[in-house]
């Protein structure tokens, strides 16, 4: 069976039905969810305006209000898990990349949901990958620390002295390996795979097209923008 995307019920339909209930409990529940139906918190009270069935989907909550990020995380994690389940039924593998992973661990509900997703994903043919520049938050949370310790594949770039020492304890690194992380330069670090730990060097020349494509350094971006005639410096001339 097929359906029109515009006919899918949204939260306001549920809200209206609650208000029509003769029992006072229904109206009390309607009052409870009212902030998510009207006003600034009604972000998810609308049909989706993007195609989530594409092969490559990116979710970004950077501009989401702080009081909505917890709800946003839960909705996106649920959407991701549903996609993993659907892909498994189609015998399709799913790659899940979570940037700024430490943000998930600011919300207790998101932590629990993400812990289940991370633990069950491999059985469903998914490969979850977490990315963070703040390893301290990961280590200080019990669930995320266990996730880190039980991961089969890790890429560890340069770390501060305290973070390197803490990582060494969690994943059982030698003193020499901890020192390598402390002294690692750009593109250098340790590769942990299947119980093996290998130092690596993968520097990208700063004058290459790949470097220009992947750099996030503000000075680089300003320089490239000016070279293209799009930066403030270029416009001021």
Roles of regions detected by a PLM:
Residues 11, 15, 26, 124, ...:
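Intrinsically disordered, low-complexity regions
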Residues 19-20, 49, 205, 216, ...:
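Short linear sequence elements within intrinsically disordered, low-complexity coil regions
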Residues 1-13, 55, 158, 166-175, ...:
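Short, exposed beta-strand "edge-strand" segments with a Pro/Gly-rich flavor and a Y/T-containing core
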Residues 115-205:
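Conserved ATP-driven motor cores of ASCE-family P-loop NTPases powering translocation/secretion/packaging/pilus
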Residues 82-86, 120-124, 153-156, 179-183, ...:
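Glycine-rich loops and low-complexity Gly/Arg-rich segments
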Residues 1-126, 139-142, 180-184, 189-195:
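P-loop NTPase motor domains
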């Amino acid at each position: 069976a097929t359906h029109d995307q515009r006919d899918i019920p949204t939260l306001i339909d549920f809200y209206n039905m609650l208000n029509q209930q003769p029992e006072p409990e229904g109206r009390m529940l309607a009052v409870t969810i009212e902030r998510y139906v009207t006003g600034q918190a009604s972000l998810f009270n609308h049909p989706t305006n993007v195609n989530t069935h594409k092969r490559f989907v990116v979710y970004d909550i950077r501009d989401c209000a702080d009081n909505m990020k917890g709800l946003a995380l839960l909705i996106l994690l649920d959407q991701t898990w549903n996609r993993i389940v659907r892909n498994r039924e189609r015998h399709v593998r799913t790659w899940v990349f979570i940037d700024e992973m430490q943000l998930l661990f600011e919300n207790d509900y998101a932590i629990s949901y993400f812990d289940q997703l991370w633990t069950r994903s491999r059985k469903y043919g998914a490969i979850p990958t977490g990315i963070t520049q703040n390893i301290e938050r990961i280590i200080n949370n019990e669930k995320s620390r266990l996730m880190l310790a039980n991961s089969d594949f890790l890429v560890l770039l340069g770390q501060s002295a305290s973070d390197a020492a803490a990582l060494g304890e969690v994943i059982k690194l030698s003193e020499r390996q901890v020192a390598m992380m402390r002294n690692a330069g750009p593109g250098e670090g340790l590769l942990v795979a299947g119980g093996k730990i290998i130092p690596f060097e993968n520097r990208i020349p700063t004058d290459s097209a790949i470097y220009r494509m992947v750099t996030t350094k503000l000075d680089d971006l300003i320089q490239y923008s000016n070279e293209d005639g799009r930066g403030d410096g270029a416009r001021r001339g």
